[in-house]
Amino acid sequence: MILVGLTGGIGSGKSTVINYFKELGVNCYQADKEAKKLMDSDQDLIRKIQNSFGDNIYINSKLDRKKLASIVFNNKEKLDLLNSLVHPAVNNHFISYCIGLKDVYIIKEVAIIFETKTQDKFDKIILVKAPKEKRINRIINRDKCNRQDAIDRINNQIDDEDKVDESDYIIENINIIDIPKKVLKIHKNILNSIKIH
């Protein structure tokens, strides 16, 4: 099975792209979504988060995401700490998820493939890019945060231009109408590359 990483900066439109791959029948694992679930359900992970960020980071057994975001997105050390707790749990979950799969290829959506230097774990990488202003607006609308918070979140990640050379496919997410065609082209290309080998 070919493992394809799908990545891109916050607000680039990775979920939109993933949904088009799903429509083509591609098995997609969304690491960020699974991480959110695990932070509310994995007792070992919950304990580690509480030990690192305080018991009051959970209210009625639910993670106070807004409070956690205000801590980690303005502090790289705290963000790195959170990632060091969450990523092993997500990786273990992904390994379990893959057991028994018969898919020709699977996409694992991971926002920070390059930031965590895990690009070598993937056979192919798809990078989703979008203009900074579009990303800022998406983050503000989605996360109900202010403009500066959105900019800080973007600045906590490696610039997209630095990811281009190590990516096999680039999707410029400027006009949503173009996305299905771009996704289909990449899908066919991946399938063809598998047939060749």
What are these regions (language model features)?
Residues 33-102:
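ATP-dependent small-molecule kinase phosphotransfer cores
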Residues 94, 102, 120-121, 132, ...:
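Small-molecule kinase domains that catalyze NTP-dependent phosphoryl transfer to phosphate-bearing small molecules
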Residues 13, 32, 82, 107, ...:
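Residue-level signal for inorganic ion chemistry
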Residues 27, 33, 124, 168-169:
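Well-ordered beta-strand positions
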Residues 92-100, 105-138:
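ATP-dependent NMP and nucleoside kinases share a basic, alpha-helical "lid"
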Residues 1-33:
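Walker A (P-loop) phosphate-binding motif
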Residues 24, 53, 121-122, 166:
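Short, structured coil segments at secondary-structure junctions
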Residues 3, 18, 35, 46, ...:
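A general structural signal for well-ordered alpha-helical segments in protein cores
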